[in-house]
UniProtKB/Swiss-Prot annotation:
It catalyses: reduced [plastocyanin] + hnu + oxidized [2Fe-2S]-[ferredoxin] = oxidized [plastocyanin] + reduced [2Fe-2S]-[ferredoxin]. It comes from Gloeothece citriformis (strain PCC 7424) (Cyanothece sp. (strain PCC 7424)). Pfam families: PsaA_PsaB (PF00223). Phylloquinone binds at residue 693. GO terms for cellular component: photosystem I; plasma membrane-derived thylakoid membrane. This is Photosystem I P700 chlorophyll a apoprotein A1. It is a multi-pass membrane protein. It is found in: Cellular thylakoid membrane. PsaA and PsaB bind P700, the primary electron donor of photosystem I (PSI), as well as the electron acceptors A0, A1 and FX. PSI is a plastocyanin/cytochrome c6-ferredoxin oxidoreductase, converting photonic excitation into a charge separation, which transfers an electron from the donor P700 chlorophyll pair to the spectroscopically characterized acceptors A0, A1, FX, FA and FB in turn. Oxidized P700 is reduced on the lumenal side of the thylakoid membrane by plastocyanin or cytochrome c6. GO terms for biological process: photosynthesis.
Length: 751
């Protein structure tokens, strides 16, 4: 830690400009007001595309970093307002249109629904009987489980929260306007990283976790304990009664009678009746022990509140971010992190790239925790919700990571200054880019040929009737011994490291089978040759995605092919006329290609997850204790061939969506077709050139002129970049809708 005399550094002050930008509805009502060229209005149809492309590209509107920073800050509040409106809508649907109260009274027999379709042209068929006499669309968002864990016991509480969401949205909209138009922070406020770290760590993460821990202890725990014991929701005291009447808490948790004395006398063990370290899952609900998660949030709060006091601001004590970075030198890293502080305080693209990469990775980790350690009551036995949550978080994580590649490339083009990065880590990585990319390329080739080759071998052997020569658990075994070792360590180690824990952190590693209402919530996931094969496909597709994105970043400014690439900008179709073979080299094009491989990677991940869980985890526990899995454990033998994936997964499990007509799942059947159509539509944009369309348009314009109905705005074909953007958007949208319909029709029909 660095300590400095107080006189050495100026005091941190919150400085703002008053009324920097007038509020003008007249200006906002003018399309393209942010750009001088666009503000003149449309002359060609390209205008509407440029309007959308540049509306949020603040760099193109001004070169003033302070103004850009203010616009981003204000936009954050707008984003939060949208999130609050969305959340409010979710809670309102739960209050007004759902069977939440009926589900709460009987969560194992009644399914969650929060939408009832009006039968205008016969859509009433979509309202399935979800139990308890309620007819509606079954939802798979998991909100009911979250609300149960939070302590919601009636619709009125959901209404109040929905109104609270709208109030927060209004506050956010006001804050966004206020901090741009009335009191706008100066640039030094945005660049004051130590204060920002302290506030974000101690305030947002620390106090946020503390507030949630408080809610869990005082509201969630008592309500959930009574619900678990079978008390009817209507008979449970309301949250404020538990908060205001200590005797009600003391009945459930005797340590409450001692108040806060044990805290100050360091006799913390007294609180172990509501702050526990049990491990595993609650056998009644199949969710994490709520007393464990309350303990977790309290510990996280303490950790982050301490972390929020680490950085030096006005008191001359603590860490300086710049000094930490510049002291970070290794024997082979030259100037180390010198210069990175300047990059991260002047390039928001660099900052965003790092944050997106971190948050994307974290989101993927969340996807895995949601099934391995299901946090909410009864979530684990709702297989459709489990599959939806996994798929959702995987895709969100994938998009964020591709976004990291995008903003990394934009940083390199717009913000990177070679003169300020001499022999530091970033400079050294860029100078080593050929070695990095060529090695990564070799890894991709190796993984691609070998992983695919194993499947080709298996298909060939099975086709020739030689099962004894296949790679499988019953012939030539390729066991994932390292993964099995990790599983074993995680199962055995807590016996020594956490002797008081009742179970391992996750039953996915090993241990018992947790069943709720005769359905498997979680059990040990055994790994074998089939998993070894598909994991190497995962490794291959992930490495190709990384190769594309990293090449886009490292070669964004220059390459041997186009030494002045940085002058052409982040997105350009080719290096001008008369120079063939220079197309698809811009930073933008690498993002474009990266999106396809991200989608490719994650399709295999979610297919693997879906089939593996149906085969080896999800199912019914029979009276004699044996488990009947949904697909009867067919993953190990069927997924080791490409034919098996097509026949026993894609085709066999698509039966539910293909045969859905005439049932409550019929909308998924239509969506399945519509998704395929949108996907096919994308190929029209991806497989044709701009010239073809421009020729066609000119014929159509000629016909309009003949009929004297020529448009005043000149029609133009989409640019090459625009065509690719439309293509990849429809490709992904079509694929996502198709997968959504396939997964939901399948899992809803087998529950």
């Amino acid at each position: 830690m660095t300590i400095s005399p107080p006189e050495r550094e100026g005091k941190v002050k919150v400085t703002v400009d008053n009324d920097p930008v007038p509020t003008s509805f007249e200006k906002w009502g003018q399309p393209g007001h942010f750009d001088r060229t666009l503000a003149r209005g449309p002359k060609t149809t390209t205008w509407i595309w440029n309007l959308h492309a540049n509306a949020h590209d603040f760099d193109s509107q001004t070169s003033d970093l302070e103004d850009v920073s203010r616009k981003i800050f204000s936009a954050h509040f707008g984003h939060l307002a949208v999130v609050f409106v969305w959340l409010s809508g979710m809670y309102f649907h739960g209050a007004r249109f759902s069977n939440y109260e009926a589900w709460l009274a009987d969560p194992t027999h009644i399914k969650p629904s929060a939408q009832v379709v009006w039968p205008i042209v016969g859509q009433g068929i979509l309202n399935a009987d979800v139990g308890g006499g309620f007819h509606g669309i079954q939802i798979t968002s998991g909100f009911f489980y979250l609300w149960r864990a939070s302590g919601f016991t009636n619709s009125y509480q959901l209404y109040c929260t929905a109104i609270g969401g709208l109030v927060m949205a209004a506050l956010m909209l006001f804050a966004g306007w206020f901090h741009y138009h009335k009191r706008a922070p100066k640039l030094e406020w945005f660049q004051n990283v130590e204060s920002m770290m302290n506030h974000h760590l101690a305030g947002l993460l620390g106090l946020g976790s503390l507030g949630w821990a408080g809610h869990q202890i005082h509201v969630s725990l008592p309500i959930n304990k009574l619900l678990d014991a079978g008390v009817a929701p209507a008979d449970i005291p309301l949250p404020h009664e538990f908060i205001l009447d200590p005797s009600k808490m003391q009945e459930l948790y005797p340590s409450f009678a001692k108040g806060i004395l044990p805290f100050f006398t360091l006799n913390w063990g007294v609180y172990s009746d509501f702050l526990t370290f049990k491990g595993g899952l609650n056998p009644v609900t199949g969710g994490l022990w709520l007393s464990d998660t309350a303990h977790h949030h309290l510990a996280i709060a303490v950790l982050f509140i301490i972390a929020g006091h680490m950085y030096r601001t006005n008191w001359g004590i603590g860490h300086s971010m710049k000094q930490i970075l510049e002291a970070h030198k290794g024997p082979f890293t030259g100037e180390g992190h010198k210069g990175l502080y300047e990059i991260l305080t002047t390039s928001w693209h660099a900052q965003l790239a790092i944050n997106l990469a971190m948050l994307g990775s974290l989101t993927i980790i969340v996807a895995h925790h949601m099934y391995a350690m299901p946090p909410y009551p009864y979530q684990a036995i709702d297989y459709a919700t489990q599959l939806s949550l996994f798929t959702h978080h995987m895709w969100i994580g994938g998009f964020l990571i591709v976004g990291a590649g995008a903003h990394g490339a934009i940083f390199m083009v717009r913000d990177y200054k070679p003169s300020q990065n001499v022999d530091n880590l970033l400079d050294r990585v860029i100078r080593h880019r050929d070695a990095i990319i060529s090695h990564l390329n070799w890894v991709c080739i190796f993984l691609g040929f070998h992983s695919f080759g194993l499947y080709v071998h298996n298909d060939t052997m099975r086709a020739l009737g030689r099962p004894q020569d296949m790679f499988s658990d019953t012939a030539i075994q390729l066991q994932p011994i390292f993964a099995q070792w990790v599983q074993n360590i995680h199962t055995v180690a807590p016996g020594a490291t956490a002797p008081n824990a009742l179970a391992p952190a996750s039953y996915a590693f090993g241990g018992d089978v947790v069943a709720v209402a005769g359905k498997v919530a979680m059990m040990p996931i055994s790994l074998g040759t089939a998993d070894f094969l598909v994991h190497h496909i995962h490794a291959f597709t992930i490495h190709v995605t990384v190769l594309i994105l990293l090449k886009g970043v490292l070669f964004a400014r220059s390459s041997r092919l186009i030494p002045d690439k940085g002058q052409l900008g982040f997105r350009f179709p080719c290096d001008g006329p008369g120079r063939g073979g220079t197309c698809q080299v811009s930073g933008w094009d690498h993002v474009f290609l990266g999106l396809f491989w991200m989608y490719n990677s994650l399709s295999i991940v979610i297919f693997h997850f879906s089939w593996k869980m149906q085969s080896d985890v999800w199912g019914s526990v029979l009276p004699d204790g044996t488990i009947s899995h949904i697909t009867g454990g067919n993953f190990a033998q069927s997924s080791i061939t490409i034919n098996g994936w097509l026949r026993d997964f894609l085709w066999a499990q698509a039966a539910n969506v293909i045969n859905s007509y005439g049932s409550a799942l019929s909308a998924y059947g239509i969506m399945f077709l519509a998704g395929h159509f949108v996907f096919a539509f994308s190929l029209m944009f991806l497989f044709s050139g701009r010239g073809y369309w421009q020729e066609l348009i000119e014929s159509i314009v000629w016909a309009h002129n003949k009929l004297r109905v020529a448009p005043s705005i000149q029609p133009r074909a989409l640019s090459i970049i625009q065509g690719r953007a439309v293509g990849v958007t429809h490709y992904l949208l079509g694929g996502i809708v198709t997968t959504w319909a396939f997964f939901l029709a399948r899992t809803l029909s087998i529950q």
